[in-house]
């Protein structure tokens, strides 16, 4: 229903317009207060790059963060990552991730980024506190913040927006009548707009999510996902249909697709109930970090990597690297 409202297919969005105007006024006033100097943002002693969204819902932001961290690491840059840690609840903040940190403490995306990149990761509702924790513990040269485009309390040097190339901005309205956290005109002020799927427009960087081999959660064995049989697909991400479409494009045809809420807490019983005898469970890598501790033999995940096209990605990386002292 939310997807139909935000796309404009359902007329119910009109009933939510008063709340959207209120959201827009409040969010606009907050941004203006920082722009005019009524509120002061905290500036880190190292460059800060924000990777965020203009819309609610999954746009492919986390794969972009991983891509950016890995590319900078390849250039010899020491990178730290901060996040709000949505979906997790730590005993105390800021929380510096370790190999023992769980998704229940830090949230699924920070744990995934930590496991994939090996970069220092810290989470805190107040992102400046997370930055300070990383700087106190690690000699990093640059901070990447996973989400937080609208978190103006943290000053930033580079802003990158990730856009769903198929859904783009829906009906164009602020939350809750539409998907917008800020108006599309905000794109004029960011340093780069990366478009996940669909058709990129002039000045935007095209991106595709490239699937790899399916990985068994228990053994680490790898195989072409199309070789798996009797698949039940599970996706607890911002936009589950994208994952299901990826499986179909890979030649895997699930018998059942189970969309879950983004950041949904998963118990062993919850997941086991999805799979019948003789069936194979295939999930996203983000779900896998939550399920690995209680995984069964027939559970697999499909990793994806961000692939950015054209000359702009290299120019963006050069620009970011030039900020590092």
From Swiss-Prot:
GO terms for biological process: lipid A biosynthetic process; lipopolysaccharide core region biosynthetic process. Pathway: Glycolipid biosynthesis; lipid IV(A) biosynthesis; lipid IV(A) from (3R)-3-hydroxytetradecanoyl-[acyl-carrier-protein] and UDP-N-acetyl-alpha-D-glucosamine: step 6/6. ATP binds at residues 55-62. It holds the Pfam family LpxK. One of its GO terms (cellular component) is plasma membrane. It comes from the Bacteria. Its EC number is 2.7.1.130. It catalyses: a lipid A disaccharide + ATP = a lipid IVA + ADP + H(+). GO terms for molecular function: ATP binding; tetraacyldisaccharide 4'-kinase activity. InterPro entries: LpxK, P-loop_NTPase. Keywords: ATP-binding, Kinase, Lipid A biosynthesis, Lipid biosynthesis, Lipid metabolism, Nucleotide-binding, Transferase. Transfers the gamma-phosphate of ATP to the 4'-position of a tetraacyldisaccharide 1-phosphate intermediate (termed DS-1-P) to form tetraacyldisaccharide 1,4'-bis-phosphate (lipid IVA). Belongs to the LpxK family. This is Tetraacyldisaccharide 4'-kinase.
């Amino acid at each position: 229903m939310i997807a139909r409202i935000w796309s404009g297919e359902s007329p119910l969005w009109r009933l939510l317009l008063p709340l959207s105007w209120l959201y827009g006024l409040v969010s606009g006033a907050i941004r203006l207060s920082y722009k005019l100097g009524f509120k002061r943002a905290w500036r880190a002693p190292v460059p800060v790059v924000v990777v965020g969204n203009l819309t609610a819902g999954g746009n492919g932001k986390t794969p972009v963060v991983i891509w950016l961290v890995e590319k900078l690491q390849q250039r010899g840059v020491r990178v730290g990552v901060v996040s709000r840690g949505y979906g997790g609840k730590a005993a105390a903040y800021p929380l510096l991730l370790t190999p023992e940190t769980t998704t229940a403490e830090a949230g699924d995306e920070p744990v995934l980024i930590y496991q994939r990149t090996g970069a220092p990761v810290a989470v805190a509702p107040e992102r400046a506190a997370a930055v300070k924790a990383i700087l106190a513990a690690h000699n990093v040269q640059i901070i990447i913040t996973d989400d937080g485009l609208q978190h103006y309390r943290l000053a930033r040097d580079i802003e990158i927006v990730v856009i769903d190339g198929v859904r783009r901005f829906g009906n164009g309205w602020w939350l809750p009548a539409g998907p917008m956290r800020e108006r599309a005109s905000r794109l004029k002020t960011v340093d780069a707009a990366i478009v996940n799927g669909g058709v990129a427009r002039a000045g935007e960087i095209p991106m595709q999510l490239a699937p790899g081999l399916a990985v068994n959660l228990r053994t680490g064995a790898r195989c072409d996902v199309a070789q798996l049989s009797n698949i039940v697909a599970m996706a607890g991400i911002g936009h589950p249909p994208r994952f299901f479409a990826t499986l179909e494009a890979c030649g895997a045809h699930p018998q059942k697709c189970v969309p879950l809420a983004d950041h949904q807490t998963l118990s062993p019983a919850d997941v086991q109930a999805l799979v019948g005898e003789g069936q194979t469970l295939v999930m996203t890598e983000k779900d896998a970090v939550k399920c690995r501790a209680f995984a069964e033999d027939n559970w697999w995940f499909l990793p994806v990597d961000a692939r950015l096209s054209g000359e702009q990605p290299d120019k963006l990386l050069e620009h970011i690297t030039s900020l590092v002292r």
